[in-house]
């Protein structure tokens, strides 16, 4: 009986290769963060920890797959192990068909009566988007159910919770992107629709990723003045005549988000989200990053914080871990800088976003936050 399952905080760890496990949070509380942390998962050489979150044993999780299916499990159903254990392959836990992969794992509020207050946004490789109430996924059978109907040449590339105070950013392989308000997509009642057009793609282009970006109410003149000021700051120049007060500059800077873009040949850059103007849904979009034979097409684009890290994976099995703060901030109309020197026959095929994993190398007090202790789990990978 589910009521007999003890309520306990768990650290859920997911590897890039599709292995998952849960570990009691208490197993991490005894770990001080003075060095590089502890081993977080025993993985193959080509695998690594790609996602970590803290959840209660009774927290429901939705697993969205590349073919548009959704599966549901509560945390206590996951295999429990030690911090060093590899976990269990999701393909052996969920009724996945051949070639079907899990693209998004979403922990949800335990109180399902609140789900009707939350929305979920879908994005497909053909540029379609759809918004539903999260409550539409409160009942999911053991064999899963359709989350979104996809054409044979389409795939689900992103799923995220959102509010009507957010924007959606779609990034395409050819270097274009589009940003539009969540409210530009009506709330669908159906799960079998493929949604509406989010971006008008060029021939043979495809959407690689979707990000939910905070909607900012900022005048164009303010935005442009701030960007001139911040660019001058990074160059070490003094630009005092911005027309904005120091308080307003600080306020805009405090709310600034950055979009990280990575290309097939190992190039990347960070760009202020203020550079991505809000447009109407369904347009052709604007330049996100200049693509060429030198840097290749876009493989991923998403919002990042200064303390995050990314992991690049190549088709040759090479891995490189890169702190976000080491990646140059540049404008949209640039090719980026080399993050990883690929060989002639090698390309980056995947980029994992490791949130808040940067290690400052300093000892912390014993009453450090649970999140810091969990993040040290990633440092050893």
Task: Set out the residue ranges of the language-model regions.
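C-terminal interaction appendages of subunits in large macromolecular complexes
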Residues: 1-381
């Amino acid at each position: 009986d589910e009521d007999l399952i003890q309520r306990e905080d768990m650290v859920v760890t997911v590897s890039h290769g599709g292995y998952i496990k849960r570990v009691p949070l208490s197993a991490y509380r005894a770990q001080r963060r003075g060095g590089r942390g502890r081993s977080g998962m025993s993985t193959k050489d080509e695998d690594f920890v790609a996602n970590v979150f803290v959840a209660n044993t009774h927290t429901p999780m939705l697993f969205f797959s590349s073919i548009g299916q959704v599966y549901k499990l509560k945390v206590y159903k996951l295999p429990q192990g030690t911090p060093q254990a590899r976990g269990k392959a999701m393909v052996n836990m969920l009724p996945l068909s051949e070639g079907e992969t899990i693209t998004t794992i979403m922990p949800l509020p335990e109180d399902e009566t609140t789900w009707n207050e939350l929305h979920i946004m879908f994005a497909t490789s053909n540029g379609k988007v759809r918004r539903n109430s999260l409550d539409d996924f409160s009942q999911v059978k053991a064999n899963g159910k359709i989350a979104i109907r996809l054409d044979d040449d389409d795939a689900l590339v992103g799923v995220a919770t959102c509010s009507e105070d957010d924007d959606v950013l779609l990034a395409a392989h050819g270097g274009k992107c589009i940003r539009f308000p969540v409210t530009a997509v009506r709330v669908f009642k159906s799960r079998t629709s493929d949604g509406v057009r989010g971006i008008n793609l060029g021939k043979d282009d495809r959407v690689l990723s979707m990000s939910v970006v905070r909607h900012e109410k900022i005048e164009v003149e303010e935005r442009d003045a701030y960007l001139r000021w911040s660019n001058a700051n990074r160059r070490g120049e003094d630009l005092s005549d911005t027309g904005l007060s120091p308080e307003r500059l600080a306020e805009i800077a405090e709310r600034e988000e950055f979009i990280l873009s990575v290309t097939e040949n190992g190039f990347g850059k960070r760009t202020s989200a203020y550079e991505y103007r809000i447009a109407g849904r369904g347009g052709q979009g604007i330049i996100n990053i200049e693509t060429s034979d030198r840097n290749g097409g876009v493989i991923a684009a998403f919002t990042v914080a200064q303390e995050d890290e990314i992991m690049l994976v190549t088709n040759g099995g090479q891995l490189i871990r890169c702190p976000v703060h080491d990646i140059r901030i540049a404008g949209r109309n640039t090719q980026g800088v080399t993050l990883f020197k690929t060989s002639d026959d090698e390309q980056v095929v995947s980029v994992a976003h490791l949130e808040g994993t940067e290690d400052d190398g300093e000892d912390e007090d014993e009453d450090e936050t649970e999140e810091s202790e969990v993040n040290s789990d990633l440092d050893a990978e």
